Amino acid sequence: MDIDHGRESDGEMVGTIASCGLLLHSLLAGLGRRAAGFARKVGGAAREDPRRVAHSLKVGLALALVSVVYFVTPLFNGLGVSAIWAVLTVVVVMEYTVGATLSKGLNRALATLVAGCIAVGAHQLAELAERCGDQGEPIVLTVLVFFVASAATFLRFIPEIKAKYDYGVTIFILTFGLVAVSSYRVEELIQLAHQRFYTIAVGVFICLCTTVFLFPVWAGEDVHKLASGNLDKLAQFIEGMEFNCFGENSVANNFGGKDSPQMHKSVLNSKATEDSLCTFAKWEPRHGQFRFRHPWSQYQKLGTLCRQCASSMEALASYVITTSKTQCPAAANPELSCKVRKTCGEMSLHSSKVLRDLAMATRTMTVPSPVNITMATAVKAAESLRSELAENTALLQVMHVAVTATLLADLVDRVKEIAECVDVLARLAHFKNPEDTKNVVVSTVSRGIDEPLPDVVIL
């Protein structure tokens, strides 16, 4: 019996060890899969935008440089323990784009300077009140902190200040409260204010140097690429609509499937990115083809029109997908149906061509080629189609075709507004004239110059 009992105990122990081994193996396998998945995400983020790797290295370099202020004894003796503020400044100010770093850096430096001056003035006023009694100074400081913090916080609700100076107002409240409250216990208040400002100035200077001079990422270039990319996406949708719904061998059921263009949906979600990039671009100095007072607000207007156009596309796509999945009655007037189909194809073709031309002109910063003929053809087709549908008595029997045509005609109107907006942008931003560019190339070739040609684009 003892032998059998011992064998049973050994068997249970072996089973327990085997279960633990399987559990450990599954845990290690799961950990390995998660690590591999995380590595793929890291690699994907780096491949999607290699500038992210450069930015990460720049942040590390900036922190390494600002650490010298804390590690070198002469510098540390000059700034004291406040030198740590330089390190904190680099951490909170360093941003991905030059404009964002300039915005936060200048906001932080200016807010610290103004708040320090006001806090020193508050301390002087509190010292005068101390003559009236021993508790006069803390009471005055408390009242001043209350009113200044309340007023500054209320300013953050103003849209203009919220958009550009929200971070600066926050730093103002922090610095004023820190210096004003510390003035009651610290004797060398002026020295404290100086040290805080100098350390923040050092941190901001290092951030700006590493951001501007080492592989800079300009918000202006990003918003410019975003605008031209959105135009390309809209053109891609209309081309897909023309091919799948109004072409000679089109099958409407194919539209809305996995292979149908859906890029217009990303245009609808681009407002937040576009607004932030435009705000940061206004802080950036002149660079490349972007002048000092470049019309960044016009990019926001163009983005608004693109999103309105994308909304019309979304309505059109939803209706086409819905009608393709339902049984629609046969048209009583095949001739009208054929005419509507042909006209819709013409509107789609001309609209996509206009958007492609506008995208190329925006991307290369050249004056758009005259789109009056192409746009006029699309508008004329839309107007004639509206008149035809309004006068036809068999409209109810081709209602699904009529609705599609009406939505597409509205889409043509949106494209026309986009074309007008790009023309205004080209005029305000002083886009290059393609004819002047062409003349430069012809003149260079005619003189037989073997030097490299300038970076020009012939449209």
Swiss-Prot record:
The question of whether Transmembrane is a record keyword is answered with yes
Q: Which residues lie on this side of the membrane: Cytoplasmic?
A: 130-137, 182-199
Q: Which domain of life is it from?
A: Eukaryota
Which InterPro entries does the entry link to? ALMT
Q: Provide this UniProt record's keywords sorted from A to Z.
A: Cell membrane, Ion channel, Ion transport, Membrane, Transmembrane, Transmembrane helix, Transport
Q: Report where it is expressed, by tissue.
A: Detected in root tips.
What are the TM regions of this chain, as residue ranges? 53-73, 74-94, 109-129, 138-158, 161-181, 200-220
What is this protein's expression induced by? Not induced by aluminum.
GO BP terms, alphabetized = malate transport; monoatomic ion transmembrane transport
Work out whether the entry's keyword set contains GTP-binding: no
Which residues point to the Extracellular side? 1-52, 95-108, 159-160, 221-459
Report the locations given in the UniProt record: Cell membrane
Reported function: Malate transporter critical for aluminum tolerance. Permeable to chloride, nitrate, sulfate and malate.
Q: Family assignment? A: Belongs to the aromatic acid exporter (TC 2.A.85) family.
Write the protein's name.
Aluminum-activated malate transporter 1
Origin organism is Triticum aestivum (Wheat)
Q: Gene name, please?
A: ALMT1
